[in-house]
């Protein structure tokens, strides 16, 4: 396996490969989650650990459990951690449907997940197994994600996920089925002329119904990346 180290800051690196890589959606989700330094966090299906590592760019959470069922993904995260200066990231190789021995049940402030976007057998599936797992609900579904989050979160704890707009009803139904009430929703488009290609949603465990729809996020401008997207990418960079 060929690895490439992607630089987030002078002190934080992500180990990426063709099997476990990352895109813009990871940065959007990390920013949308509004994590705090005192938070106890878990990132489900962490892959190369991009979301926990992004969270290290400014005041990091107290602890972040980075969970993935694939040993190759956890190995890449460990390689990234070896090259970086980080605090509180705990790599965990486990099935989110079963969690792991000693999992902090009912203790977490925040769970994040950038899940597989496609239902199993929907659309063209990649030949590489790791890519299938990342794109299709082969090893877990959005319902499995919400069930795991419900077990991990304390009362009032938050679940933040992203997905394709066509899966919005599935995500809301799964959240509500596990006592996680959708509270914030934001759609993401390339520009004002195009339909959204992504949504970001936050749910709170045990909360009462009321959802705020936030202004749409546009990621492109005439000159390239939009100002807001650039701020999201730049958040936490060391000042010289």
Indicate where each model-derived feature is located:
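SAM/dcSAM-binding transferase cores
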Residues: 195-240
């Amino acid at each position: 396996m060929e690895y490439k180290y992607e630089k987030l800051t002078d002190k934080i690196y992500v180990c990426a490969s063709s099997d476990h890589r990352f895109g813009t959606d990871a940065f959007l989700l990390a920013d949308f989650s509004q994590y705090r330094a005192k938070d106890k966090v878990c990132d489900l299906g962490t892959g190369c650990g991009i979301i926990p590592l992004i969270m290290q760019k400014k005041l990091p959470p107290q602890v972040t459990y980075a969970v993935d069922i694939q040993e190759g993904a956890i190995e890449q995260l460990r390689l990234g951690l070896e090259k970086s200066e980080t605090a509180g990231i705990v790599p965990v190789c486990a099935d989110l449907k079963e969690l792991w021995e000693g999992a902090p049940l009912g203790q977490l402030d925040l769970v994040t997940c950038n899940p597989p976007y496609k239902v199993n057998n929907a659309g063209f599936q990649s030949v590489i197994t790791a890519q299938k797992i990342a794109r299709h609900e082969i090893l877990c579904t959005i319902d499995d994600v919400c069930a795991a989050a419900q077990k991990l979160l304390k009362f009032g704890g938050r679940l933040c996920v992203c997905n394709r707009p066509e899966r919005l009803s599935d995500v809301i139904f799964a959240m509500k089925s596990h006592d996680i009430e959708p509270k914030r929703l934001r759609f993401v488009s390339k520009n004002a002329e195009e339909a959204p290609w992504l949504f970001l949603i936050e749910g709170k465990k045990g909360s009462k119904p009321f959802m705020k729809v936030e202004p749409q996020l546009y990621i492109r401008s005439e000159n390239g990346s939009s100002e807001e997207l650039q701020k999201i990418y730049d958040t936490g960079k060391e000042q010289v």
